[in-house]
Structure formats: C-alpha cells, structure tokens
Amino acid sequence: MAKAIPRSGSRRSGRIGSRKSTRRIPKGVIHVQASFNNTIVTVTDVRGRVVSWSSAGTCGFKGTRRGTPFAAQTAAGNAIRTVVDQGMQRAEVMIKGPGLGRDAALRAIRRSGILLTFVRDVTPMPHNGCRPPKKRRV
C-alpha cells in the first residue's frame, strides 16, 4: 500500500484577516425597482458599482406580502443602513416601475438622513412597441 504524502499547505488559503476594506462613499445613486410583486432597492456609487442592495424578499416577506408598501419601506431601510455607515451623505434616486412600494421606499430614503440631490422617474415607457399581454379574465 502506498504511503500518504503529507500536503505542504492546508486547504484554506491565507485570507485569515484580510477582509476587503470598506470604501468611503460620500455620494451615490439609489435605484428603486417597484413591481407589483416585489420591490428591489440597489445602492451604487457614482460609477455604477453596487455597494448595497436589498429586496422585500430578502427582508423575509413571502408571497403577496412582498408587493406591499411596508415591505418596500423595510427593504429601503435595510439597503440604506449599510451605506450610511460607510459615510454616504448625498444621493440621487432613480425610481422604476408601477408598484405600490414606490412612495413608501422614497419615504424611507428621506427619513434615513441622506440628502437627496434629485429624484427621477425612469420607468420605461414604450413608444408603441411590443404588443402587451392580453387582459386577465378572473
């Protein structure tokens, strides 16, 4: 029987205490995507790199409760809490979608203490593009 050869290094590589250092981000962009089923809040820096994100689903809301205004408010609060700790003071807000969580997410962002430079609605509107799906008959 062949002898087992001892390995020179352990399986884990040398990343014991080298966590990625948190950047100071004074200005950022907050993207709110509010659909009828869920609300997703993404915080990026000015170059578009994602710093933090949250959604109603990751906050623990399941099923139809994800589309509620309270779920959107909770998701916005979770996403912004981490960037306030990283030093964000000013932000632009881009809101997309027709969902119920639009206003609730914006209210939560205003309450967080971040100074909003502008709020823009970037909901995509077709210039008579694709044919929409047929109406539901319930």
Curated annotation (Swiss-Prot):
Residues 1-24 are annotated as: Disordered. Residues 9-24 have a biased composition (Basic residues). It comes from the Eukaryota. Keywords: Chloroplast, Plastid, Ribonucleoprotein, Ribosomal protein, RNA-binding, rRNA-binding. It is found in: Plastid, Chloroplast. InterPro entries: Ribosomal_uS11, Ribosomal_uS11_bac-type, Ribosomal_uS11_CS, Ribosomal_uS11_sf. One of its GO terms (biological process) is translation. GO terms for molecular function: rRNA binding; structural constituent of ribosome. It holds the Pfam family Ribosomal_S11. One of its GO terms (cellular component) is ribonucleoprotein complex. Part of the 30S ribosomal subunit. HAMAP family: Ribosomal_uS11 (MF_01310). Belongs to the universal ribosomal protein uS11 family. NCBIfam families: PRK05309.1, uS11_bact. This is Small ribosomal subunit protein uS11c. It comes from Panax ginseng.
